Amino acid sequence: MDQHFGIASFRSRQQVMAFEQALRRSGVKAEIVNTPRAVAAGCGLSVRFDLADERAVAEVDRATKPGNLIGFYRAEREPDGRLTVRPMGIAEGYSG
């Protein structure tokens, strides 16, 4: 995974693990990571995925309708090491 990636943030660690497994079953490269400080919400864990898989992630989101979803974010590591995080608006009904 590179310096540009997606983050799915949840309120429940159980949902983080379930969504990560659903992504992997669908062929999406995903991993559980600490939630970036800029999101500052949820259970402290999130699912990281490649932005190239954004469409597949949206399909898994629609198919599984995960509970406790806070939102999807686009993260970018700046040259100085800072992490910039912005809402993506993948989730159905999400207005980020």
Question: What is each residue range found by the language model?
Answer:
Residues H4-I7, R11-V60, K65:
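Amphipathic, hydrophobic secondary-structure cores in small proteins
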Residues A58-G96:
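C-terminal structural segments of small proteins and small subunits
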